[in-house]
Amino acid sequence: MLLTSLVLALAQAAAPAPEASPLPDLTLEQASALRCSVAFGLVHQAQRAGDGSASDYPVMAQRGQEFFVRTTARLMDETGADRETVMALVMREHAALGETPGRVDDVMPACLLMLDASGL
C-alpha cells in the first residue's frame, strides 16, 4: 500500500506545470532500473487487490518498495533531476508498461534478477 500511495502521491505532485523540465535521457541501466521499479509497484498493487496472476511473483511490498526508493533517489543524484522530473519519468514508464497487455509479465523475470542482484 505504501509503494502504491507513494507512486500516486508523487505522480500527483509531478503534474505537468507550464514550465516543466524536459525529461533527461537515461542510460540503459537507469532505464532498466526505472522500468523494474514501476513493474514492482504494479505487481504490488495487483497483489494487494488479490489479483491471482500477481501471486506468481514474490511479495513486492518491502523489497519492491525499497528498490523503487533507491532507484528514484539514484536517478535524482545521477541526472540532477528534481522529484517532479523523476516522477514524470515514473509516469511515462507506467504508461508504457500499461499500454501493452502482458508487458509487466514480460519484464518481471529480468526485473527479479535485478532485484536479487541488488541485495535487497
Ranges and model annotations:
Residues 16, 42, 85-87:
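Short linear motifs at secondary-structure transitions and domain/linker junctions
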Residues 22-78:
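Short N-proximal segments of mature Sec-exported proteins
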